[in-house]
């Protein structure tokens, strides 16, 4: 995944803001997406476990787990109502 970091202020080695009041993040080109608007992304301890739980409860995986730079992993799921939700797992 080609990911570009965006910083609005001073940044620590982790990519997080090193001073209060700034928002850092990143951008990537979306290839195909089931979502037509903004996507809520939730931080989870384990994407693998979250994907299993979503599927067990009737949801589906839209985009499987994939690395994002050296920062972590992302995946996208669809719930039983058709909402697409992003998952984020920080690399450890």
State the predicted function of each range:
Residues 1-2, 34-36, 68-73:
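Short acidic/glycine-enriched loop/turn segments that link adjacent beta-strands
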């Amino acid at each position: 995944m080609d990911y570009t970091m965006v910083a609005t202020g001073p940044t620590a080695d982790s990519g997080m803001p090193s001073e209060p009041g700034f928002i850092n993040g990143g951008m990537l080109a979306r290839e195909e997406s089931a979502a037509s608007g903004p996507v809520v992304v939730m931080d989870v301890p384990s994407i693998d476990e979250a994907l299993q739980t979503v599927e067990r409860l009737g949801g589906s995986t839209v985009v499987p787990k994939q690395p994002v730079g050296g920062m972590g992993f992302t995946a996208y799921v669809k719930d039983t109502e058709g909402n697409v939700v992003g998952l984020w797992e920080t690399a450890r």
